[in-house]
Amino acid sequence: MNRALIIIDFINEFLHPDGKITPQGMGKFCEEYGVIWNAKKLIDFFRKNNEEIIWIHLGFHENYDNCSNLSPRFKWAPSMWILRENTWSVEFVKELGYKSEEKTITKTRVSPFYKTELEAYLLEKWITEIVVAGVATDLAVSSITR
């Protein structure tokens, strides 16, 4: 049995005090309930056991041509000039100790499967069990576990 830890959306824009979305409550909730600390424990455990870790985060092109204006979750991103690829906004929070040599997938929708290589990667690595840690249980975490 091959197992993978999937880390979803632990990004600055959602969790860092300087994030434009953080005031909506995710950052405070995660701090209050130790979400980042618990995710870090999982990451350390998987690394210690040489198990697969997959990092998933949002990331839109600089011109937002891959950001759907039909998406109720992200259609406002261009007006706030956030969640662009290769910016501080979508970097993983430093507390988790992200390593670029671990598999990283950029998504443009809530679902980490939508137009990404996630499914193909899981099949390629013969992953039969996943452990998921994310900051939006009702959104991205739910969509990957359904």
Mark where each language-model region is.
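Generic detector of well-ordered alpha-helical packing
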Residues: 10-13, 107, 139
